[in-house]
Amino acid sequence: MSKFVVGLTGGIGSGKTTVANLFAEEGICLVDADVVAREVVAPGTHGLNAIISHFGTEMLTASGELDRAKLRQRVFNDEQERQWLNQLLHPMIRQEMLLQVEKATSDYVIMVVPLLFENGLDRLVHRTLVVDISPELQISRTVQRDNVDATQVNNIINSQCSRSEKLARADDIIDNHGEISRLKREVHALHQRYLQLSGNHNAHD
Protein backbone atom coordinates (compact mmCIF):
# COMPACT_ATOMS: atom_id res chain seq x y z
CA MET A 1 0.00 0.00 0.00
CA SER A 2 1.59 3.23 -1.16
CA LYS A 3 -0.29 5.57 1.21
CA PHE A 4 0.70 6.07 4.83
CA VAL A 5 -2.30 4.85 6.85
CA VAL A 6 -3.19 5.40 10.50
CA GLY A 7 -5.74 2.99 11.98
CA LEU A 8 -8.02 4.84 14.42
CA THR A 9 -9.93 2.73 16.92
CA GLY A 10 -11.46 2.75 20.40
CA GLY A 11 -14.32 1.14 22.27
CA ILE A 12 -17.98 2.07 21.91
CA GLY A 13 -18.66 5.64 23.08
CA SER A 14 -14.95 6.52 23.24
CA GLY A 15 -15.24 9.44 20.81
CA LYS A 16 -13.72 7.91 17.65
CA THR A 17 -16.02 9.94 15.40
CA THR A 18 -15.15 13.22 17.14
CA VAL A 19 -11.42 12.49 16.80
CA ALA A 20 -11.83 11.40 13.15
CA ASN A 21 -13.70 14.63 12.35
CA LEU A 22 -10.89 16.69 13.93
CA PHE A 23 -8.41 14.99 11.57
CA ALA A 24 -10.80 15.76 8.68
CA GLU A 25 -10.70 19.43 9.74
CA GLU A 26 -6.91 19.23 9.29
CA GLY A 27 -7.59 18.22 5.67
CA ILE A 28 -7.06 14.48 6.09
CA CYS A 29 -9.15 11.93 4.17
CA LEU A 30 -11.12 9.44 6.27
CA VAL A 31 -11.97 5.86 5.33
CA ASP A 32 -14.67 4.71 7.76
CA ALA A 33 -15.34 0.97 8.15
CA ASP A 34 -18.93 1.57 9.32
CA VAL A 35 -19.71 3.70 6.25
CA VAL A 36 -18.08 1.13 3.92
CA ALA A 37 -20.02 -1.69 5.65
CA ARG A 38 -23.25 0.09 4.65
CA GLU A 39 -22.02 0.80 1.10
CA VAL A 40 -21.25 -2.87 0.29
CA VAL A 41 -24.86 -3.89 1.09
CA ALA A 42 -26.62 -0.94 -0.59
CA PRO A 43 -29.47 -1.79 -3.01
CA GLY A 44 -28.15 -3.31 -6.26
CA THR A 45 -24.84 -4.49 -4.79
CA HIS A 46 -23.48 -8.02 -4.94
CA GLY A 47 -23.38 -7.98 -1.13
CA LEU A 48 -27.12 -7.35 -0.73
CA ASN A 49 -28.04 -9.80 -3.51
CA ALA A 50 -26.00 -12.55 -1.82
CA ILE A 51 -27.70 -11.87 1.54
CA ILE A 52 -31.18 -12.01 -0.05
CA SER A 53 -30.49 -15.28 -1.89
CA HIS A 54 -29.16 -16.81 1.35
CA PHE A 55 -31.64 -15.48 3.95
CA GLY A 56 -34.62 -14.52 1.78
CA THR A 57 -36.43 -11.28 0.95
CA GLU A 58 -37.70 -10.89 4.53
CA MET A 59 -34.31 -9.29 5.21
CA LEU A 60 -35.43 -6.25 3.17
CA THR A 61 -37.28 -3.17 4.35
CA ALA A 62 -40.35 -1.93 2.46
CA SER A 63 -38.09 0.43 0.48
CA GLY A 64 -35.81 -2.43 -0.66
CA GLU A 65 -32.90 -1.74 1.68
CA LEU A 66 -31.25 -4.19 4.05
CA ASP A 67 -33.07 -4.48 7.37
CA ARG A 68 -29.95 -4.44 9.55
CA ALA A 69 -31.80 -5.03 12.82
CA LYS A 70 -33.54 -8.11 11.41
CA LEU A 71 -30.30 -9.50 9.99
CA ARG A 72 -28.48 -8.91 13.30
CA GLN A 73 -31.27 -10.75 15.11
CA ARG A 74 -31.12 -13.61 12.59
CA VAL A 75 -27.38 -14.27 13.02
CA PHE A 76 -26.98 -13.27 16.69
CA ASN A 77 -27.43 -16.75 18.18
CA ASP A 78 -26.42 -18.73 15.09
CA GLU A 79 -22.65 -19.11 14.93
CA GLN A 80 -22.74 -20.81 11.49
CA GLU A 81 -24.84 -18.09 9.87
CA ARG A 82 -22.75 -15.37 11.50
CA GLN A 83 -19.60 -16.94 10.08
CA TRP A 84 -21.20 -17.15 6.63
CA LEU A 85 -22.11 -13.46 6.79
CA ASN A 86 -18.65 -12.43 8.01
CA GLN A 87 -16.96 -14.47 5.27
CA LEU A 88 -19.13 -12.71 2.69
CA LEU A 89 -18.80 -9.14 3.98
CA HIS A 90 -15.34 -8.84 5.55
CA PRO A 91 -13.37 -9.33 2.28
CA MET A 92 -15.72 -6.87 0.50
CA ILE A 93 -15.31 -4.25 3.22
CA ARG A 94 -11.54 -4.72 3.29
CA GLN A 95 -11.24 -4.43 -0.51
CA GLU A 96 -13.42 -1.30 -0.67
CA MET A 97 -11.47 0.34 2.17
CA LEU A 98 -8.17 -0.29 0.38
CA LEU A 99 -9.63 1.19 -2.83
CA GLN A 100 -10.70 4.31 -0.94
CA VAL A 101 -7.25 4.59 0.67
CA GLU A 102 -5.58 4.56 -2.75
CA LYS A 103 -7.99 7.21 -4.07
CA ALA A 104 -7.36 9.53 -1.10
CA THR A 105 -5.63 12.81 -1.92
CA SER A 106 -4.28 13.79 1.53
CA ASP A 107 -0.69 13.15 2.67
CA TYR A 108 -1.86 10.29 4.86
CA VAL A 109 -5.18 8.57 5.54
CA ILE A 110 -7.11 7.89 8.74
CA MET A 111 -8.83 4.49 8.62
CA VAL A 112 -11.61 4.48 11.24
CA VAL A 113 -12.23 0.89 12.36
CA PRO A 114 -14.15 0.06 15.57
CA LEU A 115 -12.84 -3.54 15.57
CA LEU A 116 -9.35 -2.81 14.22
CA PHE A 117 -7.52 -5.40 16.35
CA GLU A 118 -10.42 -7.87 16.64
CA ASN A 119 -10.73 -8.25 12.84
CA GLY A 120 -6.98 -8.19 12.16
CA LEU A 121 -7.25 -4.94 10.18
CA ASP A 122 -4.30 -3.48 12.09
CA ARG A 123 -2.20 -5.44 9.56
CA LEU A 124 -3.37 -2.99 6.86
CA VAL A 125 -2.09 0.13 8.63
CA HIS A 126 1.32 1.62 9.38
CA ARG A 127 0.37 3.04 12.76
CA THR A 128 -2.43 2.50 15.27
CA LEU A 129 -4.16 5.24 17.27
CA VAL A 130 -6.46 4.32 20.18
CA VAL A 131 -9.00 6.76 21.64
CA ASP A 132 -9.17 5.88 25.33
CA ILE A 133 -11.77 6.56 28.03
CA SER A 134 -12.78 4.68 31.17
CA PRO A 135 -15.47 1.95 30.89
CA GLU A 136 -17.71 3.99 33.23
CA LEU A 137 -17.59 6.94 30.85
CA GLN A 138 -18.10 4.63 27.84
CA ILE A 139 -21.30 3.33 29.41
CA SER A 140 -22.71 6.73 30.48
CA ARG A 141 -21.94 8.36 27.09
CA THR A 142 -23.41 5.50 25.05
CA VAL A 143 -26.55 5.22 27.22
CA GLN A 144 -27.12 8.95 26.70
CA ARG A 145 -26.31 8.94 22.97
CA ASP A 146 -28.07 5.75 21.82
CA ASN A 147 -30.86 5.58 24.39
CA VAL A 148 -29.95 1.99 25.35
CA ASP A 149 -29.57 0.43 28.79
CA ALA A 150 -26.25 0.03 30.57
CA THR A 151 -26.36 -3.80 30.45
CA GLN A 152 -26.46 -3.75 26.64
CA VAL A 153 -23.49 -1.39 26.50
CA ASN A 154 -21.59 -3.51 29.00
CA ASN A 155 -22.18 -6.62 26.85
CA ILE A 156 -20.76 -4.80 23.81
CA ILE A 157 -17.70 -3.65 25.79
CA ASN A 158 -17.10 -7.22 27.00
CA SER A 159 -17.38 -8.60 23.46
CA GLN A 160 -14.64 -6.24 22.24
CA CYS A 161 -10.89 -6.33 22.75
CA SER A 162 -10.12 -5.31 26.36
CA ARG A 163 -9.04 -1.78 27.18
CA SER A 164 -5.63 -2.98 28.43
CA GLU A 165 -5.01 -4.99 25.24
CA LYS A 166 -5.96 -2.05 23.02
CA LEU A 167 -3.60 0.24 24.93
CA ALA A 168 -0.79 -2.32 24.82
CA ARG A 169 -1.12 -2.63 21.03
CA ALA A 170 -1.49 1.10 20.31
CA ASP A 171 1.33 3.11 18.76
CA ASP A 172 -0.39 6.32 19.84
CA ILE A 173 -3.08 7.01 22.44
CA ILE A 174 -5.53 9.91 22.77
CA ASP A 175 -6.94 10.34 26.27
CA ASN A 176 -10.52 11.55 25.73
CA HIS A 177 -11.44 12.32 29.35
CA GLY A 178 -10.88 16.07 28.98
CA GLU A 179 -12.27 19.09 27.18
CA ILE A 180 -12.69 19.38 23.39
CA SER A 181 -9.99 22.11 23.32
CA ARG A 182 -7.46 19.66 24.75
CA LEU A 183 -8.58 17.01 22.26
CA LYS A 184 -8.02 19.46 19.38
CA ARG A 185 -4.49 20.14 20.60
CA GLU A 186 -3.73 16.41 20.84
CA VAL A 187 -5.07 15.78 17.33
CA HIS A 188 -3.11 18.72 15.91
CA ALA A 189 0.14 17.45 17.49
CA LEU A 190 -0.46 13.94 16.11
CA HIS A 191 -1.33 15.42 12.71
CA GLN A 192 2.09 17.12 12.58
CA ARG A 193 3.75 13.84 13.57
CA TYR A 194 1.86 11.86 10.93
CA LEU A 195 2.76 14.42 8.24
CA GLN A 196 6.40 13.87 9.15
CA LEU A 197 6.04 10.07 9.14
CA SER A 198 4.10 10.05 5.86
CA GLY A 199 6.78 12.27 4.29
CA ASN A 200 9.45 9.76 5.23
CA HIS A 201 7.25 6.88 4.06
CA ASN A 202 6.53 8.50 0.68
CA ALA A 203 10.20 9.39 0.18
CA HIS A 204 11.21 5.74 0.54
CA ASP A 205 8.28 4.30 -1.41
Curated annotation (Swiss-Prot):
Which stretches make up the DPCK domain?
5-201
First-tier enzyme category under EC: transferase
Which GO annotations describe the biological process of this protein?
A: coenzyme A biosynthetic process
> What EC number(s) would the UniProt record show?
2.7.1.24
**InterPro entries from the UniProt entry:** Depp_CoAkinase, P-loop_NTPase
Pathway in which the depicted protein is active = Cofactor biosynthesis; coenzyme A biosynthesis; CoA from (R)-pantothenate: step 5/5
Binding positions for ATP per the UniProt entry: 13-18
* Subcellular location as annotated: Cytoplasm
Membrane-crossing residue ranges in chain numbering = none
Which keywords describe this protein according to UniProt?
Answer: ATP-binding, Coenzyme A biosynthesis, Cytoplasm, Kinase, Nucleotide-binding, Transferase
How is this protein annotated for GO cellular component?
cytoplasm
- A GO molecular-function term, please? ATP binding
Name the reaction it catalyses: 3'-dephospho-CoA + ATP = ADP + CoA + H(+)
User: Pfam families in the record, alphabetically?
Assistant: CoaE
Q: What does this protein do?
A: Catalyzes the phosphorylation of the 3'-hydroxyl group of dephosphocoenzyme A to form coenzyme A.
Q: Which family does it belong to?
A: Belongs to the CoaE family.
* Protein's recorded name: Dephospho-CoA kinase
Q: Which organism is it from?
A: Shewanella oneidensis (strain ATCC 700550 / JCM 31522 / CIP 106686 / LMG 19005 / NCIMB 14063 / MR-1)
Top-down, what is the taxonomic lineage of the species of origin?
Bacteria, Pseudomonadati, Pseudomonadota, Gammaproteobacteria, Alteromonadales
